[in-house]
Amino acid sequence: MQLAYFHVAADVPQGAEPDAAVVIDVLRATTTIAWALNNGAEAVETFADLDQLRQSAAQWPESSRLMLGERGGQRIEGFDLGNSPVAVVPEQVAGKRLFMSTTNGTRSLQRVRGVQRLFTLALPNRKAVADHLLMDPPEQLWIVGSGWEGAYSLEDSLAAGALADLLLDAAADEACVANDELTAALALWQQWKHDPEACLRQASHGQRLIGLGDHDADFRCCAELDRLSVVPVQVKPGVLCAS
């Protein structure tokens, strides 16, 4: 199992495709996806384009859908929810399809949506995703971060290192690091693994969220390691369900 990490969607090689890919957006899209599916959402359908989201959502009854939209860390006007994992509680999302677009995470999902086995990862479901991958290890696994508007993000690299640390430990001689980006992510995880929330808060995107208001609950939720057993799996392009 060859493991490679790409900081943002634009870094993903053109004309190549791995056996499996994992998309990360710690603050906050993939954390929100994990919690929404854990709390009973029927599916999360992701969009980079807002007009496409609105058109698709309009085909569903209002009673069985929610629109989640975020730009610049804030909820988009006219949408039901923003991009907060603490907002997708069971009484809001159970049984509903969530139509979601965010500043960063949904772009990375769109970039690798053609990969046969596609998952999303956050710190709360790290072990669940690792265990799922280890049941049928891919020859080549791409871990794709989301960054912030095309730039590197500390928190996504932290989670990439956290996942790789588990996979390398469990697979022993059958797994290897395929690029320097992942080597750096592993080192970052070793530095912050005892206090991931501090890393999230120090990251530039964490500082951006702090500047927007009180997001303490989001930080706690996003940093809570191995809390969930849910594995979000793409079942058709752009549509994620719980496994």
Curated annotation (Swiss-Prot):
Co-factor requirement: Mg(2+)
Keywords in alphabetical order: Hydrolase, Magnesium
Pfam families cross-referenced by the UniProt entry: 2-ph_phosp
InterPro entries per record: ComB-like, ComB-like_sf
Catalyzed reactions per annotation: (2R)-O-phospho-3-sulfolactate + H2O = (2R)-3-sulfolactate + phosphate
Gene3D superfamilies documented for this protein: ComB-like (3.90.1560.10)
GO molecular-function terms, A-Z: 2-phosphosulfolactate phosphatase activity; magnesium ion binding; sulfopyruvate decarboxylase activity
Enzyme Commission number(s): 3.1.3.71
UniProt keyword annotation of Hydrolase present: yes
Highest rank taxon of the organism: Bacteria
Keyword Cytoplasm: no
SUPFAM superfamilies in UniProt: ComB-like
PANTHER family, per database record: 2-PHOSPHOSULFOLACTATE PHOSPHATASE-RELATED (PTHR37311:SF1)
HAMAP family, per the entry: ComB (MF_00490)
Family to which this protein belongs: Belongs to the ComB family.
Protein name per Swiss-Prot or TrEMBL: Probable 2-phosphosulfolactate phosphatase
The species this protein was found in: Prochlorococcus marinus (strain MIT 9313)
Taxonomic placement: Bacteria, Bacillati, Cyanobacteriota, Cyanophyceae, Synechococcales
